[in-house]
Amino acid sequence: MTLPSGDSSITNNTNQTLNEDEKRRLRREKLAALRQKKLAEAQNGEGNKRQEGNGNGTGQGTGNVAADLTTKRNEKQKVENSFAKLNSTSIDHSSTETQATSLEEKQRLLLKRQGQRIEDWKKNRSADTASHFPQRAKENLSHTRIAITKKSTFKLPKIKRNNNKRVFGFVNEDKEGGGGKEEEDEEEEFTKKKILKIANDDARDYLNYGEKFRKPVLEEAEDDLDQFIESISKSESFVDNNNGGKQVQEQNVEEEKQQQQQQQLEQEQEQEQEQLEKLPRYLAVNNNNNEDTDEVYRYEEDFDDEFDEDDEDDINKRLSAKLNKLQNTAKELKEIDHTSIEYPKFRKHFYQVPFEMSTMDNRELDMLRLELDNVRARGKNVPPPFLTWGQLLMPESVMSVIQNDLGFAKPSPIQCQAIPIVLSGRDMIGVAKTGSGKTLSYVLPMVRHIQDQLFPKPGEGPIGLVLSPTRELALQIEKEILKFSSTMDLKVCCCYGGSNIENQISELKRGVNVIVATPGRLIDLLAANGGRITTLRRTTFVVLDEADRMFDMGFEPQIQKIFTQIRPDKQTVLFSATFPRKLEQLAKKVLHNPIEIIVGGVSVVASEISQEIILFEDTDQLMNHKIQKLEDILSRFFDLGKNTGKVLVFVEKQTDADKLVSVLLKKAIPCIAIHGGKDQIDRKHAIREFSDDQSGINVLIATSIAARGLDVRNLDLVVNFEPPSHLEDYVHRVGRTGRAGKHGEAITFVDNTQEKEISILVKALKMSSRAVDSKLQEIADKFMKKIESGEEKRSSGFGGKGLEKLQNVRETNMQLQKKMFGNFKKEDGKKSHRDLSEQVDYFGSSSSSSSFPSSSNTTTTTTTTSTASAIEIPTFEIIEGNSPETSGPDKCKFYCRVTINDLPQKVRWGIVQRESLSKIIEASKTSITTRGQFYPPQSKQTPTNDQPKLYLLIEGLTRKAVEEAAVLIRDKMLQGVEAMRLDNHSAPTGRYVV
């Protein structure tokens, strides 16, 4: 766009010589002759007809001006108008000169004034040329994108719009012909209108009003002086007045308006310059687009909305918002409205019931499941199992892998029942012991799903998705799936943390059939690049492997977030070796009408594994004795000719693993360690070396990180150098051997002080129907007595409070039936608790204590009251102020001490469990901590101020928050009392419900 001209001196070209006297003299003579001719023609003009000069001929050139001077009358008017203009602008002439009536005198004065104006013009132009143009450009052209030349001679600007960068530079391009003052003014007006239009169009695109104005380009005349002389003769008009010869100076009024507009424009430009100085600028050199442009100042911040240049706070808010957007690194997934997406249909049902099974009735099928390692199936319309691979009617490409590569002559018990359920399109929960073939139970149906659908296009996402809790398990699953890729077009991508994400992104962009991933890394990939790397909209088959471990590691929020990205009609399969309560609750959320199958027993060691417990005496030489025993076991193992066998040794801590490796290496026993403290590349290297039969490393020292998902061929011996802390960990550790029907051996080291661990081992031996040593049984019985007295606490395992419930469900047919048909209702018990809560005075005065009501209108409340009558109910006294137990800046304003030492063991455990306290803390916004020391009921020790009885300290900022926490704790107590009552008064029930 062009820049409105406010200083006419800027429009001249300094490349032409202005001080040649000869040229100036010739031009003056030419001008005088022209004036004489015009004056003569004006005196002999016809009529009194007057015409106004045409001032809208900008850019028409000298040809249009000459045409306008054809009539004599117009020539006379222009001469008279020129005289009036010069006469009005002169500040040092008398009024008598301005009122001269003689045409000769007017002509003389006109020539004199023209000479003075020429000299003034020369002086002004010289001063402008010598001035520092970049500084003037900064003052007059202060817009966002401006190009400044550093040369002494400058070119007039030319419009050059760049939609990408919007950089405007000055160019050296003149037009041909001369332009007068009127053309200049009209071109200015035209340029302003054009600027206004462009500014309105571009205001939506960027913040800075920044289209740089530039001055109009005059058409080239003979030189600049000729332009000025011609402008004098063509820019002035003279109007005669019939009444008295009154002179009207319209041109002066127009020039004053233009000067006012120019001043206003300069003020606006100065305001914009002040705003732009507060914003970042970037300097760049632009030699490609304009040879005469040395420096280009660019403002490259583009906002979507136009800002108020008078409001600096508005600019700061926008900059802060943009900074916060850049700093927001949270991995948030886009919400998907599945109701608005029309997903393509897919087939789930592939299973055809074998003829042999279709002829069996339910009783015969139950007997068949009993023979298959006591398989139990719960749900509606459970498909019958199969017995041979041929009954599945799988493609030949799949059958060749099963029989030749995998070497499975017949399916395992869980495969016999799980594969028909999954191939029937049903959601399933599979609970089976480790090494029972769970992986193949979902790999075969997933492969069948993939074969029935088109290969995903790049960016569409996988058809099958397998989630695992650990990297090692993910790699093991990928290895099993890749065995089927040799006979079919199957592409698998294993995504896990600790590895290069760029390679995983490259594989996903090319397209894959299956993704095996850990939840955290999968969310990273789904959120990367705005969700354009991959999606889960094509996913129709989802597997959660080792689901119990996944939820114990805190992956539940990530899993729920992932499931929001998958189509609702997907098929979901969940496999686990244990099934705690919280896993059961989540299964109800993500599964639709599932079938639950249980093979063998939950947390039971496989019958193919022989178990041995070695008891040590607690002495100073305990570690040396254990190392010596381990060395003897390894020597005996390898001396028996099992040179190709592998040995896995479990320890409790990472430092113990490294120390044991150094000890064995000193004894010339090749070994390697793996634990969570090692990098992913070191862990992969350790597993690869241990799995390779030719590596020479047959001993692996590991923590419980290798207890799940590690499937190594010829792993014949597992040694627990340190015993596990809970039953599930023990089952998974020893489950690394004896896999796929092979025999294995497990040896565990314990000392006589590890009573808790010994009780776990004794329980595992009994559950697997193994003989128990009398010394071990004696220590276990001693520990159980301590538990009953409250001195010790039973291990909770992987949050495994649901294990006892599952065992009771399996043993009680009535509960199985109720849960299957949805008749089991917990509202009655909750209602009783609610009624009790409403009748109890929770918060009396500080000196009074709360107690259960003595009577109630309902039988349940009466029974609960009688049960609780023998229990000393703790008080809930809320005290205002800071508790003495808490120090530091986080003191609260209210607190309450609830003594739980004298509560029954079951009630006390139900309150202090981490999951229960976490829910109460989150709901009430308080802090709850366990303080004091446990004193058994028959203990002779007396509580002291330093060591009071076991109690809960509730702290909150408000009384209401502490009251809410106390109410929730009281409800937990009531639930515990109700559970005790049901256990004590439960009567035998029948199998059927009428």
Swiss-Prot record:
EC top class, as a word = hydrolase
Reaction(s) catalysed (UniProt annotation) = ATP + H2O = ADP + phosphate + H(+)
List the InterPro entries hit by this protein, alphabetically.
DEAD/DEAH_box_helicase_dom, Helicase_ATP-bd, Helicase_C-like, P-loop_NTPase, PRP5/DDX46/KHDC4_KH, RNA-helicase_DEAD-box_CS, RNA_helicase_DEAD_Q_motif
Limits of the Helicase C-terminal domain: 629-780
The protein's predominant localisation is: nucleus
Q: Which UniProt keywords apply?
A: ATP-binding, Coiled coil, Helicase, Hydrolase, mRNA processing, mRNA splicing, Nucleotide-binding, Nucleus
Q: Where is the composition biased (Polar residues)?
A: 1-18, 84-102, 235-245
Region Disordered: list its residue ranges: 1-105, 170-190, 235-275, 842-867
What GO terms fall under cellular component here? nucleus
Q: What is its EC number?
A: 3.6.4.13
Claim: Kinase is one of the keywords in the record: no
Which ranges belong to the motif Q motif? 387-416
Renumbered ranges of motif DEAD box: 545-548
Regions of compositional bias (Low complexity) in chain numbering:
845-867
KW Lipid metabolism (keyword) present: no
- Could you tell me where the Basic and acidic residues compositional bias lies? 20-32, 70-79, 172-181
Report the record's Gene Ontology biological process terms.
mRNA processing; RNA splicing
Q: What does this protein do?
A: ATP-dependent RNA helicase involved spliceosome assembly and in nuclear splicing. Catalyzes an ATP-dependent conformational change of U2 snRNP. Bridges U1 and U2 snRNPs and enables stable U2 snRNP association with intron RNA.
Family named by the database record:
Belongs to the DEAD box helicase family. DDX46/PRP5 subfamily.
Protein name, entry field: Pre-mRNA-processing ATP-dependent RNA helicase PRP5
Organism (species): Lodderomyces elongisporus (strain ATCC 11503 / CBS 2605 / JCM 1781 / NBRC 1676 / NRRL YB-4239)
